[in-house]
Amino acid sequence: PQQMMSSVVKTYFAEKIGVKPEDIVMVSVMPCTAKKDEITRPQQLVDGIKVTDYVVTTRELGKMARFKNIPFVNLPEEDYDNPLGTSTGAAAIFGVTGGVMEAALRTAYEVVTGEKLPKLEFDQVRGLEGVREAEIDLKGKKIKIAVAHGMANVKRLLSDIKEGKRYYDFIEIMACYGGCIGGGGQPKNLDADILKKRSAAIYSIDEMSVLRRSHENPDIIKLYNEFLEKPNSHKAHHLLHTHYTDRSKAVRKAKKAEESVK
C-alpha cells in the first residue's frame, strides 16, 4: 500500500496539481520498520524515480510530537487532502491480521457473483490464532483460504504447503504477530492485551465507515477512469505492482563469507 500510494502521488496527483514528480517529497508514516528498507529496492522505482522518499515509524512520529511539545491527542480532527482523501473500512482493516484477506473477499464476492454481499464481516479470518483457514463459498464457487501471522506460524504453514499437506487458493501472510498493529515501529507497550485493543479499534473504524468495500471508494473509481484506465491494465500493473527475485544463494554466500572471517 505504501508504494502504491506513493506511485500514484508522483504520477496522477503530480499531474493533477501541476507539479513535477521530482519536486514532491513523499513521506509515509508506518507501523513497520521494514518499510524503510522497502523504499530502497530498485524494483520500486517508477520511471527511474524513487516514489517514497522517507519513512517515519509511528513510534518516531510520537517522539517528534513530544519533542516539539505538540499535544497530539488534543489536535482537532480534519479531513484528508483531495484527491485521494477518501478511505474505506476495508482499508482500515488492512492493519490487522486477516484484514487484507477480508477486504479482498468483500470485493471478490461481489465481482464474482455480481451481487451485494449480505454480511460484510468474515469471522473465519478474524482473531489472533497463529494460523487460520477456511473455505469460503462465493455462491457455488468455493475457495480455500489461509491467514498466518508471526514468522514461526508462517514457516509452519509454508512447510505444510510444500509437503503437499495443505492446498489454498489465497493466502495472507504478515510477518508481525497481530499484523501491522504489532509492527516493529509501533509504540512500545507493556499492556498484554494491547493487540486485542488495537484490533478492536480497527474493526470499530470499519463498522463506523460509510464506505466499507474497497471498490466503492469514489476516489479509486475516479483514479481508474481518469488515469489507470481499468483494473489490471498495463498502466496499473506498471505503477501498482512489483516483483521479487530469489536471493537465497546470495544470502547463503554472504553468511559463509561472514563465518569464514570469524
Locations of the language-model features?
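Iron-sulfur-associated redox domains of electron-transfer enzymes in respiratory
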Residues: P1-K262
